[in-house]
Amino acid sequence: MRDRLMLLSGWAFGPAALEPLAELLRERGPHLQVDIVSLPTLGDPDAWLDELDARLPADRWLAGWSLGGMLATQLAARRGDACNGLITLCSNPCFRSRDDWPAAMPAEVFEAFHAAFRLGPEETRKRFSLLASRGGFDARTLARQLEVSRLECPVAALDAGLQLLAALDGREAMRRFVGPQLHLFAGNDALVPAAAAQALLDWLPDVEVDVIENASHALPLERAEDIATAMLAFMQRGEED
């Protein structure tokens, strides 16, 4: 079904953060069925991809925000022709920097954040909302909107999500998936540096990559209209190919 899209949420946030984008996609693409998918709430990070694969129907477009995009990438590579195309929003192939992928959050910054989360999950989640909204036009309002959309789930599941953010490397999955790919980044993102866009394009020049300037990591919430326009145009091109 080429008119169906599964939209995966980001770490610690529920469907509400993606609902404005989903509504615009439905309004502007009346034949498009859009389903927002919450991330797994399992304490075992190794089980997340299998859980998503079992829960999400095949023959859909896969899209995701941040960690959701990283997982959508892995799932697209696993499904191959059973995935119509891949769209990621503020998703770095490697969220934490590596020697061969420096365009990411410095490893020591990530480790400090993860340690802080284990000591004080509630305070760290609030800090994450502030970081996700930093660089936006109205960061304070964005942070409040993100707080309202927080996913209520076990701390162990949130910790598993952080483990995945540290461990996942989507480069090989992107290379293996031969369907259409669109990767959108935010120019003022405080969590995924905009430099990752050029790094990705240099590494995999056959995919579509763009940077939405003057936008924060909360890209699908802050710039829903721009993202909906870009996604629908990309999907239309994919169906024409």
PLM regions: where:
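Conserved alpha/beta-hydrolase catalytic His-Asp/Glu region
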Residues: 119-173
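Acidic beta-to-alpha connecting loop that harbors the catalytic carboxylate
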Residues: 11, 187-189, 214-216
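Conserved HGGG/HGGXW glycine-rich cap/lid loop of the alpha/beta-hydrolase fold
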Residues: 1-46
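Gly/Ala-rich beta-loop-alpha elbow adjacent to hydrolase catalytic centers
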Residues: 64-68, 72
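Short beta-strand/loop motif that positions the catalytic acidic residue
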Residues: 177, 183-185, 189
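Conserved alpha/beta-hydrolase "acid-adjacent" motif
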Residues: 190-196
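Flexible "cap/lid" loop of the alpha/beta hydrolase fold
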Residues: 83-116, 157-160
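Catalytic histidine-centered segment of alpha/beta-hydrolase-like enzymes
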Residues: 215-228
